[in-house]
């Protein structure tokens, strides 16, 4: 073999090695981004007898799954490339209707699939409740309520500002018209951001307190029951880029840091002491609601599921601080009705984790929850139809009439039948731009109101004043003049029928049988 050939061979080998190393280096720098897509869930709504649930997902990295309830257990899972199939076994249900979450995780990606199971004795179809029960009488006095949304709860640059979200100033005429329309109560959400001084006094701005008091006066003169609260001071939102937007009522921080929790409780005590003192002489028409939608930004499916109950315990502490602060001011506040809400005001999480505060006043606490199920229909307008007559391709795969009945029946069993009044502090459904979709919207709202009355609860529509159509457009009445927005009168009429009709032939069943076709 010649020296030239040997050298040429060596050069070729070196070049080949360089090429291989180059390719290897290039390939290793291309990393697949994590993703998670749910392909199918079958079935998502279980019969009482139980059975198997199959969930198929596509993901990178390979997904894992875990149930948050003991009655659903993982039986097996198989993976091939990016596809994973999970099989769960659900036990037979011997009690009330129930639901559970199955968390699917792939790297940093996570989703929760809600599985529902019917009651073994159809308790979701309970007859109308005895309206002579004390808790029902209280709820019935609140009746059908209207939220003055995106008003005193609005804020810009972390400062509360009544007109910053598009509504003009609310007037006495507004609430007179609300009463005339058929509502019996008004919930007045209040944000206090930028209106509170530094520690240790946390003095509330006098002008802002006066404006809140002025709107409460409007409600009183209109003959409406009224609820005021601390609203967006606890708002939290996790943005798509991961940015965690939150404010001083930081449930995550408080659960991790005792000093932060102590500081939050001191501010909460000071603020509710001042609010209660300002309204000490107001009569029973006025209710205080301590907090609103406190959560970690994931709406009940975040770190609250993995922190061993710390956030639930912190929220229970905050609610106790609220009750103690109000009661200590005396006067009418010694026995004023107070609204208590659980984690993110979820009915399910409230029932599971809320510990009702100790209260020196007897039977003066109310439970507040919110209901927008399914949010993809009620809030986001991703689906145009709802209920058993909706086209499968145009409605969400869960959250129909049976789900609603189960949720309300569970609240009835947990609270109303035990003497604790319940009000649905927020519910609603956004306006659509066509008659067919509006028919399903009105059916949904009528059904919610009828189900609330049937189960002995009050219910409040969320009106944010937005006169458009689509996502977050839930205006029924102009917030300055009280005039109707779009088909607001028609929508209010079906809700008042749903809540107030005493016709014995008008039931949830008859309403169901007359759903839009």
Residue ranges and their predicted role:
Residues 121-185:
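N-terminal carbohydrate-binding accessory modules
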Residues 58-85:
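Surface-exposed binding patches on compact interaction domains or structured appendages
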Residues 37-66:
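Solvent-exposed, low-complexity, repeat-rich "mucin-like" stalks and linkers
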Residues 18-40, 107-128:
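Bacterial Sec-dependent N-terminal signal peptides
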Residues 256, 262-399, 409-430, 454-457:
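Active-site region of glycoside hydrolase catalytic domains
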Residues 166-186, 200-232, 236-290, 315-330:
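An active-site-proximal structural segment forming one wall of the substrate-binding cleft
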Residues 96-108:
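A short beta-strand micro-motif common to beta-rich folds, especially ectodomain repeats
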Residues 434-517:
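Aromatic-rich peripheral "rim/lid" segments of glycoside hydrolase catalytic domains that contact
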């Amino acid at each position: 073999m010649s020296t030239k050939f040997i050298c040429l061979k060596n050069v070729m080998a070196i070049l080949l090695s360089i090429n291989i190393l180059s390719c290897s280096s290039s390939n290793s720098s291309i990393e697949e981004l994590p993703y998670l897509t749910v392909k199918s869930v079958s079935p998502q709504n279980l019969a009482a007898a139980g059975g198997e649930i199959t969930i198929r997902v596509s993901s990178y990295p390979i997904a894992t799954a875990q149930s948050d309830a003991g009655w659903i257990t993982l039986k097996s899972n198989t993976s091939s490339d990016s596809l994973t199939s999970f099989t769960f076994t659900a036990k037979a249900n011997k009690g009330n209707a129930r639901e559970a979450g199955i968390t699917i995780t792939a790297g940093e990606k996570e989703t929760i699939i809600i599985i529902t199971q019917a009651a073994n004795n159809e308790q979701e179809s309970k007859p109308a409740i005895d309206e002579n029960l004390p808790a029902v009488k209280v709820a019935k006095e609140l009746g059908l309520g209207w939220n003055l949304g995106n008003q005193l709860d609005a804020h810009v640059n972390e400062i509360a500002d009544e007109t910053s979200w598009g509504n003009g100033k609310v007037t006495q005429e507004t609430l007179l018209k609300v009463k005339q329309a058929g509502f019996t109560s008004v919930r007045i959400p209040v944000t206090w951001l930028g209106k509170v001084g530094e520690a240790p006094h946390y003095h509330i701005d006098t002008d802002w307190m006066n404006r809140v008091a002025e709107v409460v006066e409007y409600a009183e003169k209109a003959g409406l029951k009224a609820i005021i609260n601390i609203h967006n001071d606890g708002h939290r939102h996790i943005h798509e880029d991961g940015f965690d937007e939150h404010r001083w009522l930081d449930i995550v921080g408080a659960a991790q840091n005792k000093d932060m929790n102590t500081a939050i409780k001191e501010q909460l005590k000071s603020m509710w002491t001042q609010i209660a003192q300002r309204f000490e002489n107001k009569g029973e028409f006025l209710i205080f609601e301590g907090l609103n939608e406190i959560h970690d930004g994931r709406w009940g499916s975040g770190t609250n599921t993995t922190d061993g109950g710390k956030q639930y315990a912190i929220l229970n502490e905050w609610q106790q601080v609220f009750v103690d602060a109000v009661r200590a001011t005396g006067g009418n506040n010694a026995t004023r009705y107070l609204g208590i809400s659980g984690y993110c005001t979820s009915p399910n999480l409230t029932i599971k984790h809320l510990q009702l505060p100790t209260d020196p006043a007897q039977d003066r606490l109310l439970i507040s929850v919110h209901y927008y199920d399914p949010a993809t229909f009620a809030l986001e307008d991703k689906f145009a139809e709802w209920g058993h007559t909706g086209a499968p391709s145009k409605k969400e795969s869960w959250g129909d009439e049976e789900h609603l009945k189960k949720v309300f029946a569970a609240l009835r069993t947990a609270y109303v039948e035990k003497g604790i009044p319940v009000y649905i502090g927020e519910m609603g459904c956004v306006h659509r731009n066509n008659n067919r979709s509006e028919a399903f919207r009105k059916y949904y709202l009528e059904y919610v109101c009828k189900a609330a009355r049937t189960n002995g609860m009050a219910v409040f529509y969320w009106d944010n004043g937005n006169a458009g159509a689509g996502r977050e457009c839930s205006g029924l009445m102009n917030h300055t003049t009280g005039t109707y927005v779009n088909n607001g009168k028609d929508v209010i009429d079906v809700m008042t029928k749903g809540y107030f009709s005493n016709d014995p032939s008008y039931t949830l069943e008859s309403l169901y049988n007359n759903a839009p076709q």
